[in-house]
Amino acid sequence: MKQSLILAVLCLALVFATIEAKPKADPNIIVGGCIKCHVKNASGRCVRIVGCGVDKVPDLFSDPNIIVGGCSKCHKQDSSGNCVRIAGCGVDPVRDAE
C-alpha cells in the first residue's frame, strides 16, 4: 500500500514537472531568422508584419519598419508596381505641397 502511494506521488510529480518544462510564449521567438511579427523582405531585411501583435490597426506614423504592400513606411505601390509616397504621411510638408 505504501509503495503504491509513493509511486502515485512520484507519477504526479513527474506529470507536473513535464507541464512546467513546456516553453512559455516568448515575445522574441525567432521565425525565419527574424523576431516575432517580422519577416524577411526581398533584400533580406527583417520587416514588421502589419497587424501582428498588439498593434491590430497598422500605425503608419510610428513604426519605421512597417511594410505595406511591399513598400516602406509612408509609401504604397502604384498601378505600375512602383513604391510611391503617401501624401500627408509622416513629417514632410514640403514634399506634400508638391
Curated annotation (Swiss-Prot):
<keyword id="KW-0800">Toxin</keyword>
<feature type="disulfide bond">
    <location>
        <begin position="37"/>
        <end position="52"/>
    </location>
</feature>
<feature type="propeptide">
    <location>
        <begin position="63"/>
        <end position="64"/>
    </location>
</feature>
<keyword id="KW-0964">Secreted</keyword>
<keyword id="KW-1015">Disulfide bond</keyword>
<comment type="similarity">
    <text>Belongs to the sea anemone BBH family.</text>
</comment>
<protein>
    <recommendedName>
        <fullName>Peptides MS9.1</fullName>
    </recommendedName>
</protein>
<feature type="propeptide">
    <location>
        <begin position="92"/>
        <end position="98"/>
    </location>
</feature>
<keyword id="KW-0166">Nematocyst</keyword>
<keyword id="KW-0732">Signal</keyword>
<dbReference type="GO" id="GO:0042151">
    <property type="term" value="C:nematocyst"/>
</dbReference>
<dbReference type="GO" id="GO:0090729">
    <property type="term" value="F:toxin activity"/>
</dbReference>
<feature type="disulfide bond">
    <location>
        <begin position="34"/>
        <end position="46"/>
    </location>
</feature>
<feature type="propeptide">
    <location>
        <begin position="22"/>
        <end position="27"/>
    </location>
</feature>
<dbReference type="GO" id="GO:0005576">
    <property type="term" value="C:extracellular region"/>
</dbReference>
<feature type="signal peptide">
    <location>
        <begin position="1"/>
        <end position="21"/>
    </location>
</feature>
